[in-house]
């Protein structure tokens, strides 16, 4: 009985607190738990201690989840397999995809790739092109594709998410980043199947993102490769296997990576192929051999080449619009790629690549690289190089598309087709072979394909392809693969030596690019099959180069072999025109490798280009083994070997740079690039880029790319990269070499690659990126990818036409070397620029001087106005570089602003360099010449507050005027909050300086937009003469978290002063609390601001400013009509609401609140004179005041004595308006204001707004308040105490028992700020009373009045029927409101509560 009593009494209390009317039912034996559940279900959930009847998520807990037949509503809630509610909102496809993604994650990198591929695959499906289905297959390969596939649809919708999530899951951070990218890509995937294919690529790239992911991506690509051919796929599958292994470990990756590399190349290719596969259709063509395609392409490759490209192009055509958009997207998407964006772009790339088919392939490559990029920035760097390669390829591929007919040729190439494959190399090979054969112009196209060979990176897949080309080629590929795998291993290196990776990535690029180059080597092999093998060896060596330069050396001998291929290149040289094309052709795959070689091959085309290319050779160096070989061959096969040595290691390269010198004057040029190349080594990836350069136009791009890669590697690299920028000059040449078309394509390539580098800048650059310069701009995009890259990228920006101008600023002496005199002067500027912005400035003058050249070249910049845009970007980039990557954050802005400034380009270059501020309206040098010239500086920064989600943007605009003593500075603060409200604060500081002093006037203009209504407040801030004085100008609300976790606000005073320099200084003065005891014994806390000032005699003056917390709630009880006498004596009727409130003494007070006036009154007053006859008959003149009042059409005139005229204009209320008002707790309420119209001295109307009181709707509890109810029950066995906490937050009352909420209700009463304890004691058999301060105690059974500390009328009239066992202490309004439960049962609460207790004890 004791337990039962305790239990029931406690529940009686609970029910009483809840205000339940079911006490009788409970006390007389009804199901108590059901009754409680019915009453409290709206407040109770299982996790808050609900009854045992609500478990398992059945319809008793969540009736909204079941229809009237009890069937689950799957669209409303989430159910498990037993139709139990998991949570009362729909299961999200993303969650299931996440589950699949978890599966993916378990599958790990493969899954990841697959999931991406899934996306792609479904999308693949979408793109029939998908033939991709191979990809799907591949995705299957990648993952247990089946699951992925099944999930893939979801994945597709969520696939971006899934891809990302799964990838994210598997490769964690990298993947996550990549996953977002994947998401981007998947969206893009959504954008197009091709995108899908690219997304698979992206996925692939995501895999790459994994890093092994790259392998994984390769595995995706493997998917592609499966498309390539069963055997390719076999490789692919190996890749797949390896890729997981790769995921497992990079070493395996190495081994597998070789396959993977092949496959990854394929991946690249395949992804590119995939892209092409979207192109697949190309791919399909690829499928046809997909990679085999490569081979097939070799055989069918014509199809593949041509058709893939062609098909892809047709598909491209279909996709091409997408592609086109995507291609711009490719640029932009690449940009989008940024990284994720890269991924996205990669998808788009896919699309775009598809558009190009191969270009998109390039894109895919980019995608691939981007995924790698996703995988890791270093890899990204590397991947970006690869991407660059691929992007070159993209260019090429697009060109390939153009060349695709050539591709047809290439199919002819088909033998080289496989070269094609490698070219994608294949295309270049093809182009090379057949294109070249067909026509050097085609060769030019093919040089694009050389870009393709960049694709060779992809082509490395193509290398796989090339293996397809021939088993031995494949062997080469394998070698390449090997190197690439090493690269993969180095990819860790890449990560660690991402510069290497960059290099290696170059090598990755290398290998991939090397792969590319290898592919290209393959291409080279294509140049000669054995050569290719050599090339592959080179590839191997190049990765080995990554591994060790000595191998590079050895490989360089191989390179020599390849140099024989180089010889081919040389031969290409013979066909130098073709070299341009043909060199690209030449090994154009090599050219790819060469391409880096290409440059050299192209270089071969023209030694000057070679020189330029030699930079690229440096770049090639990176390709070093092969590309350099190419380069070397071009330089000289052995020289290039030297170059390779350089490639072998940047330090060696440095050493070798001397070799480079020896390598030949060209090499010398390259040697500067060698310097570059040493940097290149760091930037070697850039070298990779160079290889992209290889596609010479790409070379341009790639140079840029190179620059960017190098830039990525290091700013010094940037310098070196600028040499590549030089390459970009070469680009000029190379573009010349290739053919401007290639250049165009290469630009795209650049853009893609750069896109790879970094989408954001790429984005900006992307538009330009398509421009050849843009490519470089793309490089800058890469710069965007990473701030270091950005720095480099700025050089890239330089690289872009910018290369000429900015790159000159930014670029670097290397460029100068390569650039030649233009670059030199500018390069000095640029190198110095690199060294320091000031130098850049000075140099910028030089740059300007060079800009004459720059100008000339800048004309180039301008001529390549895309480049100019680039140069703008350069500017922006440089500003970014100079300012720091900060600005790069908003690379888009930069691009735009930069582009804006780009018109200024040359001066802006210096300006930017001189100052990161975006606006160099004039070159700083020209400003001093005009004393009265005005320079406006505008800087912008955005700060996002993590805690409350508001982002605040500060824009500072300063306009100093020389030779004038007045300066105006304006700072605009824009705060955007999650509730869609926007607050703009404008601080205007006017400093007027005379000969001796400066006076500052400050005014803050605060504008708040709430729900479409605008409130403007002018807050003048007085000038504080004494610095020691603290004057609280205004108060502010500071959010504070109490120790118990409650969030409240504290009022602080803001003291605003001006220091000796005339700058505004604000200081926060916390307001102290003063405790005071009220008459009823309650202690209140009053916040007051303590203001300390210094008096006239130096004494300290302390002033306390009390701050009232309390808000009264006013309700209009009724409306009446009141007569009102105006200042002019006229009496009018107004409508007013009568508000009845209770003051602190408990007395009722009435107060009228004006509502709406019935008429509009206009008035004026003036003086008049008229004659007056005095009593003595004399006539004089008297002056009187006349007040004229107009009401509607009526006019009233009143004459008063002059002394009775109002001293100020009469104020007449025109109307009452309700305006929004934001309370300190961020609640938005309304405020009633009167609009007053006054007449000034000139009888002009003046409008004034004044608040007229509190609106009837306003209720604002100052703080979250909570009270404690201590409930004690006693019986023979002793006493037990229960504590119930009542928390009041806003107008929500939450009652908790033992920490769990049992009642939550809304109250319309204003809840005052206080905290009280209420004690209840119940003793059986006798009466006990607990005295508490301020309480009224009565032991008689008569009614006990409950008196509250506040005298609230809600409680005054109520009474408690007290049994002999109950005593009620003082109850505050908030506590009483809680105890009374909801409004429906408040009147009967006390009765139920007492009766319930009595009955409970009777039953007990």
UniProtKB/Swiss-Prot annotation:
Signal peptide region: 1-19
Keywords: Cell membrane, Glycoprotein, GPI-anchor, Lipoprotein, Membrane, Repeat, Signal
Region (Disordered): 113-833
Stimuli inducing this protein: Induced during chlamydospore formation and filamentous growth. Expression is regulated by the NRG1 and TUP1 transcription factors.
Its membrane topology: Lipid-anchor; GPI-anchor
GO cellular component, one term: plasma membrane
Transmembrane segments: none
Covalently lipidated residues, kind GPI-anchor amidated asparagine: 1382
Glycosylated position list: 817, 994, 1074
Removed propeptide positions: 1383-1404
88 X 6 AA approximate tandem repeats, as annotated region: 104-541
Sequence ranges of the Sequence repeats: 104-109, 136-141, 156-161, 162-167, 183-188, 196-201, 203-208, 209-214, 216-221, 222-227, 228-233, 234-239, 247-252, 253-258, 261-266, 267-272, 274-279, 280-285, 286-291, 292-297, 298-303, 304-309, 317-322, 324-329, 330-335, 336-341, 343-348, 349-354, 355-360, 361-366, 374-379, 380-385, 388-393, 394-399, 401-406, 407-412, 413-418, 419-424, 425-430, 431-436, 444-449, 450-455, 457-462, 463-468, 469-474, 475-480, 488-493, 494-500, 502-507, 508-513, 515-520, 521-526, 527-532, 533-538, 546-551, 552-557, 560-565, 566-571, 573-578, 579-584, 585-590, 591-596, 604-609, 611-616, 617-622, 623-628, 629-634, 635-640, 641-646, 654-659, 660-665, 668-673, 674-679, 681-686, 687-692, 693-698, 699-704, 712-717, 719-724, 725-730, 731-736, 737-742, 743-748, 749-754, 771-776, 777-782, 797-802, 824-829
Location(s) in or outside the cell: Cell membrane
Top-level division of the source organism's lineage: Eukaryota
Further information: The PGA55 mRNA is transported by SHE3 to bud in yeast cells, as well as to the hyphal tips during filamentous growth.
Functional note: Predicted GPI-anchored adhesin-like protein which may be involved in filamentous growth and chlamydospore formation.
Protein name in UniProt: Probable GPI-anchored adhesin-like protein PGA55
Gene giving rise to this polypeptide: PGA55
């Amino acid at each position: 009985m004791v337990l039962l009593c305790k239990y029931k009494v406690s529940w009686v209390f609970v029910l009483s607190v809840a205000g339940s009317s079911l006490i009788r039912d409970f006390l007389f034996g009804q199901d108590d738990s059901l009754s409680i559940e019915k009453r409290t279900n709206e407040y109770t959930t299982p996790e808050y201690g609900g009854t045992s009847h609500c478990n398992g998520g059945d319809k008793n807990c969540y009736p909204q989840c079941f229809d009237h037949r009890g069937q689950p509503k799957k669209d409303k809630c989430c159910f498990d397999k037993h139709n139990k509610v998991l949570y009362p909102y729909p299961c999200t496809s993303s969650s299931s995809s996440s589950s699949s993604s978890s599966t993916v994650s378990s599958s790990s990198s493969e899954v990841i790739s697959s999931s991406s591929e899934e996306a792609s695959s479904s999308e693949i499906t979408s793109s029939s092109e998908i033939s991709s289905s191979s990809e799907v297959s591949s995705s299957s390969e990648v993952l247990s594709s089946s699951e992925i596939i099944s999930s893939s649809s979801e994945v597709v919708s969520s696939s971006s998410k899934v891809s990302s999530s799964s990838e994210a899951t598997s490769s964690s951070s990298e993947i996550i980043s990549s996953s977002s990218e994947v998401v981007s890509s998947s969206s893009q995937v959504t954008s197009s199947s091709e995108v899908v294919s690219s997304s698979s690529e992206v996925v692939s790239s995501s895999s790459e993102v994994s890093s092994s992911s790259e392998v994984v991506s390769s595995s995706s690509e493997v998917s592609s490769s499966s498309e390539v051919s069963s055997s390719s796929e076999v490789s692919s599958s190996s890749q797949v296997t390896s890729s997981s292994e790769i995921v497992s470990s990079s070493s395996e990756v190495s081994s597998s990576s070789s396959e993977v590399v092949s496959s990854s190349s394929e991946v690249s290719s395949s992804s590119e192929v995939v892209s092409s596969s979207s192109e697949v259709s190309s791919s399909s063509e690829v499928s046809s051999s997909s990679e085999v395609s490569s081979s097939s392409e070799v055989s069918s490759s014509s199809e593949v080449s041509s058709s893939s490209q062609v098909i892809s192009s047709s598909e491209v055509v279909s996709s091409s619009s997408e592609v086109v958009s995507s291609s711009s997207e490719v640029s932009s998407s690449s940009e989008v790629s940024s990284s994720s964006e890269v991924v996205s772009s990669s998808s788009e790339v896919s699309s775009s690549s598809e558009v190009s088919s191969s270009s998109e392939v390039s894109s895919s490559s980019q995608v691939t690289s981007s995924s790698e990029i996703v995988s890791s920035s270093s890899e990204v760097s590397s991947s970006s190089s690869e991407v660059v390669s691929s992007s070159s390829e993209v260019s090429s591929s697009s060109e390939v598309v153009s060349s695709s007919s050539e591709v047809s040729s290439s199919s002819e190439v088909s033998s080289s087709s496989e070269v094609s494959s490698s070219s994608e190399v294949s295309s270049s090979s093809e182009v090379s072979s057949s294109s070249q054969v067909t026509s050097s112009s085609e060769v030019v196209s093919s040089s694009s394909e050389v870009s393709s060979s960049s694709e060779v990176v992809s082509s490395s897949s193509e290398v796989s392809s090339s293996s397809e080309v021939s088993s031995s080629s494949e062997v080469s590929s394998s070698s390449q693969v090997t190197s690439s795998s090493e690269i993969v291993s180095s990819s860790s290196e890449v990560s660690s030596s991402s510069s290497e990776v960059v290099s290696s990535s170059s090598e990755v690029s290398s290998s991939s690019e090397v792969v590319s180059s290898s592919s290209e080597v393959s291409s080279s092999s294509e140049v000669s099959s054995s050569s290719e093998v050599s090339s592959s060896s080179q590839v191997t060596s190049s990765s080995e180069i990554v591994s060790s330069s000595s191998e590079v050396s050895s490989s360089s001998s191989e390179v020599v072999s390849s140099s024989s291929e180089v010889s081919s290149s040389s031969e290409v040289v013979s066909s130098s025109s073709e070299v341009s094309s043909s060199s690209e052709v030449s090994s154009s795959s090599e050219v790819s490798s060469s391409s880096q070689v290409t440059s050299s091959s192209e270089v071969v085309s023209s030694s000057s280009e070679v020189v330029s290319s030699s930079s690229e050779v440096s770049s090639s160096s990176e390709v070093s083994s092969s590309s350099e070989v190419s380069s070397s061959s071009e330089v000289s096969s052995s020289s290039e070997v030297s170059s390779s040595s350089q490639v072998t290691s940047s330090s060696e390269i440095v050493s070798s740079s001397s070799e480079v010198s020896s390598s030949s004057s060209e090499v010398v040029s390259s040697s500067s690039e060698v310097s570059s190349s040493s940097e290149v080594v760091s930037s070697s990836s850039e070298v990779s880029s160079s290889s992209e350069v290889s596609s010479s136009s790409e070379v341009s791009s790639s140079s840029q790319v190179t620059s960017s890669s190098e830039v990525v590697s290091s700013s010094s690299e940037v310098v070196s990269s600028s040499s590549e920028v030089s390459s970009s000059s070469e680009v000029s040449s190379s573009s010349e070499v290739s053919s401007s078309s290639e250049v165009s394509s290469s630009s795209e390539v650049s853009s893609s690659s750069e896109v790879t580098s970094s989408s954001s800048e790429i984005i900006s650059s992307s538009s330009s990126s398509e421009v050849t310069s843009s490519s470089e701009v793309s490089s800058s995009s890469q710069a965007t990818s990473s701030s270091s890259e950005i720095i480099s990228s700025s050089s890239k920006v330089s690289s872009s036409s910018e290369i000429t101008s900015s790159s000159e600023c930014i670029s670097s002496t290397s460029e100068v070397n390569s650039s030649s005199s233009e670059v030199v002067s500018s390069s000095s500027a640029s190198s110095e620029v690199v060294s320091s912005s000031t130098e850049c400035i000075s140099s910028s003058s030089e740059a300007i001087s060079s800009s004459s050249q720059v100008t000339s070249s800048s004309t180039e910049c301008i001529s390549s106005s895309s480049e100019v845009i680039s140069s703008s970007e350069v500017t922006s980039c440089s500003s970014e570089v100079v300012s720091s990557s900060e600005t790069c954050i908003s690379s888009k802005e930069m691009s735009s602003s930069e582009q804006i400034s780009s018109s200024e380009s040359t001066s802006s270059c210096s300006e930017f360099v001189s100052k990161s501020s975006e606006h160099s309206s004039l070159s700083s040098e020209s400003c001093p010449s005009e004393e009265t010239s005005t320079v406006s500086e505008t800087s912008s920064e955005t700060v996002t507050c993590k805690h409350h989600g508001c982002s605040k943007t500060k824009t500072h605009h300063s306009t100093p005027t020389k030779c004038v003593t007045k300066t105006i500075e304006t700072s605009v603060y824009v705060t955007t909050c999650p509730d869609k409200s926007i607050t703009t604060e404008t601080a205007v500081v006017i400093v007027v300086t005379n000969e001796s002093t400066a006076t500052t006037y400050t005014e803050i203009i605060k504008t708040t937009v709430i729900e479409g209504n605008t409130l403007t407040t002018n807050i003048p801030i007085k000038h504080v003469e004494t610095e020691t004085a603290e004057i609280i100008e205004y108060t502010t609300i500071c959010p504070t978290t109490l120790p118990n976790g409650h969030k409240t606000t504290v009022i602080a005073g803001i003291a605003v002063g001006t220091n000796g320099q005339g700058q505004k200084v604000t200081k926060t003065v916390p307001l102290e609390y003063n405790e005071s005891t009220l008459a009823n014994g309650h202690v209140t806390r009053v916040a007051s601001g303590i203001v300390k000032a210094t008096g006239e005699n130096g004494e300290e003056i302390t002033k306390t400013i009390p701050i009232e917390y309390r808000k009264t709630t006013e309700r209009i009880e009724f409306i009446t009509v009141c007569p009102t006498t105006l200042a002019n004596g006229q009496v009018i009727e107004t409508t007013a609401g009568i508000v009845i409130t209770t003051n602190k003494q408990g007395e009722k007070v009435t107060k009228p609140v004006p509502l709406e006036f019935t008429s509009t009154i206009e008035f004026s007053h003036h003086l008049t004179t008229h004659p007056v006859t005095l009593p003595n008959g004399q006539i004089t003149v008297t002056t009187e005041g006349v007040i004229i009042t107009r009401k509607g059409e009526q006019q009233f005139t009143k004459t008063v004595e002059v002394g009775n005229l109002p001293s100020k204009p009469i104020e007449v209320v025109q109307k009452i308006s309700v305006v929004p008002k934001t309370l300190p707790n961020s609640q938005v309420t309304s405020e009633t204001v009167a609009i007053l119209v006054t007449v000034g001295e000139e009888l002009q109307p003046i409008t004034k707004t004044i608040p007229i009181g509190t609106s009837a709707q306003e209720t604002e509890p100052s703080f979250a308040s909570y009270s404690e109810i201590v409930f004690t029950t006693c019986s023979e066995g002793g006493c037990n105490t229960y504590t119930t906490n009542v928390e009041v937050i806003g107008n929500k009352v939450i009652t908790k028992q033992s920490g769990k909420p049992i009642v939550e209700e809304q109250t319309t009463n204003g809840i005052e700020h206080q905290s009280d304890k209420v004690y209840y004691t119940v003793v059986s058999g006798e009466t006990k009373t607990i005295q508490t301060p301020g309480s009224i105690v009565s032991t008689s059974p008569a009614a006990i009045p409950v008196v509250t500390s506040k005298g609230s009328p809600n409680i005054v009239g109520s009474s408690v029927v007290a049994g002999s066992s109950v005593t009620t202490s003082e109850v505050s309004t908030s506590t009483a409101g809680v105890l009374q439960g909801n409004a429906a049962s408040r009147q009967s609460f006390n009765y139920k509560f007492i009766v319930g207790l009595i009955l409970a004890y009777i039953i007990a």
